[in-house]
Amino acid sequence: LAVGDYAYLVDAAGDIREAVAVLAFDAAKATIDLARGVLDTTPQSHASGTRLIGVGEWLAAEGAERAPGESVFVGAIPRTSTDQGDALLASNGQPLVLTGRQALPYPPGRIRLNGQAEPAVVAGDLTLAWAHRDRTQQTAYLVQQDAGDIGPEAGVSYTVRIRDRNDALVHTETGITGSSFIWDVASAADAGALGDHVTLEIVAERDGLESWQPQVRAVDRAGYGLRWGQHGGGV
């Protein structure tokens, strides 16, 4: 790996969780700096044992045309000038299900809740804002999460889903073409006391296709009747 390369964070099952960009190495401290959630991925939580796998410059292609939903086995066969080894199968030897990722719209970036990147608690109206992304334009370099607007891709809209602390869906807003959404106090009242902690999910959509990964943020809500024991009903 070198600075400027990208890599994947892969879980114990061999599934890709997140793409990251390599920003810097520190040999003395044995550390590596990464930019989270590049390309069509978003920042995820990762369990112990997650592996960082670099993406090299060696590529292979087959002539067969395949469709999303098909399953294939993928592997590499190590060879020398005189011999070859056993195939090294991807995904721990499990079949890979094709998803057609290359056609899916990129999720938005630069997520903000009431103007903040990662607030622990908000009060009053909840304003969710984001920056546009465009898979057709993001080809020259790895765009980081906090970058401003790129695009949007033609035909893209956004869907916001809000879940309460029991993970029940309490609101869905579709067809958003701008870069923000406000869940006002009156609308939020429908969630009742369970709305004191909400998870927000935002995806990009185009022609019936949804971004491969959503942007997800969780936050406490303070206000009248909400989180009195923690925030005194306010922030």
List PLM regions with ranges:
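Exposed beta-strand and adjacent loop surfaces of beta-rich binding modules
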Residues: 4-6, 19, 125, 155-159, ...
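Small/polar beta-strand repeat architecture
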Residues: 14-93, 99
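Ser/Thr- and Asn-enriched, surface-exposed coil loops between beta-strands
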Residues: 26-33, 122-124, 175-181
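Beta-strand-rich modules
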Residues: 66-86, 182-214
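Pro/Thr/Ser/Gly-rich low-complexity, intrinsically disordered linker/stalk tracts
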Residues: 87-141, 208-234
